[in-house]
């Protein structure tokens, strides 16, 4: 498929055109940098203030501002991104609103709408625009394929207290991913989800240094530490490269063993 040629370095994604949403920090930022290192041309999409404050270690990212709560803005930003790239091979839908909203009994309509609008509807609209661009650029013809990677969460299939809106929206992303995989297979578009567990988005192991959070990680994560954004980005590279050509409708869980056991299961094991 066509690319704009912002990056010409050899790598596993050489010649590929990619869009990453939620690109200004954490997993999104690490994915942008990993894709650039692997030779892709990359549009980094996020809220304007966040993009303005972001400096990538790898040169070449094309910043485009977009608010995932604004439906019209999504279509416009995606069209701009595809035009500037000259096509689209890879979409990483990672933009999300994080955090809890209190007990379910106190969950307001406004908070529910806010989380669903960004995390669920924003993902849907981004992926629909991306898939349409991929088909228009020739995905599914002459053996050409494309990739959509959603960023879910262990909360896509595991609940936690006082986060009903976030958990429900992330669960929706999981099923949307599977539905897209089925519908888009005929067009050569492979769709998969990455489900991270606790990730230190500061990137320097300080995000979980607060004693309560540190103890929680020790109790709940088999590896005894939070993940790093770069460890999640590694999976995003794998799912985007040619070697993943028979993987679709699947989830890669990156949680250090959190979902493999009962919460608190490591409490005795570390003594």
From Swiss-Prot:
Reaction equations catalysed: an N-acyl-D-mannosamine + NAD(+) = an N-acyl-D-mannosaminolactone + NADH + H(+)
Its EC number(s): 1.1.1.233
Family matches, as SUPFAM superfamilies: NAD(P)-binding Rossmann-fold domains
PROSITE patterns referenced in this protein's UniProt entry, alphabetically: ADH_SHORT (PS00061)
Annotated residues for binding of NAD(+): 20-44
Active-site residues, as the UniProt record annotates them: 166 (proton acceptor)
Keyword Ribonucleoprotein: no
InterPro entries the UniProt entry points to: NAD(P)-bd_dom_sf, Sc_DH/Rdtase_CS, SDR_fam
Keyword set, alphabetical order: NAD, Oxidoreductase
Keyword Oxidoreductase attached: yes
Note: NAM-DH may be applicable to the quantitative determination of sialic acid in serum.
Function: Acts on acetyl-D-mannosamine and glycolyl-D-mannosamine.
Recorded family membership: Belongs to the short-chain dehydrogenases/reductases (SDR) family.
Name this polypeptide is given: N-acylmannosamine 1-dehydrogenase
Organism: Flavobacterium sp. (strain 141-8)
């Amino acid at each position: 498929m066509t690319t704009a040629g912002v990056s010409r370095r050899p790598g596993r994604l050489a010649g590929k055109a990619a869009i990453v949403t939620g690109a200004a920090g954490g997993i999104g930022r690490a994915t942008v940098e990993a894709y650039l290192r692997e030779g892709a041309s990359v549009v980094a999409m996020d809220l304007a203030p966040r993009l303005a404050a972001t400096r990538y270690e790898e040169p070449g990212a094309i910043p485009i501002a977009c608010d995932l709560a604004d439906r019209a803005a999504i279509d416009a930003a995606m069209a701009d991104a595809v035009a500037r790239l000259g096509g689209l091979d890879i979409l990483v839908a990672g933009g999300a609103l994080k955090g809890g909203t209190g007990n379910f009994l106190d969950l307001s309509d406004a908070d529910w709408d806010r989380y669903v609008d960004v995390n669920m509807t924003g993902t849907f609209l981004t992926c629909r625009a991306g898939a349409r661009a991929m088909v228009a650029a020739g995905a599914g013809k002459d053996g050409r394929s494309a990739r959509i990677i959603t960023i879910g969460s262990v909360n896509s299939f595991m609940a936690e207290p006082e986060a009903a809106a976030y958990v429900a929206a992330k669960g929706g992303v999981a099923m949307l991913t599977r539905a897209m995989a089925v519908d888009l297979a005929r067009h050569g578009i492979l769709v998969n989800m990455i489900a991270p567990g606790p990730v230190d988005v500061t990137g320097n192991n300080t995000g979980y240094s607060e004693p309560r959070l540190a103890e929680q990680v020790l109790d709940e994560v088999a590896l005894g530490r939070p993940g790093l954004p770069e460890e999640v980005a590694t999976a995003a590279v794998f799912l985007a490269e040619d070697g993943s050509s028979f993987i679709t409708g699947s989830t890669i869980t990156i949680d250090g063993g959190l979902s493999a056991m009962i919460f608190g299961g490591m409490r005795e094991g570390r003594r």
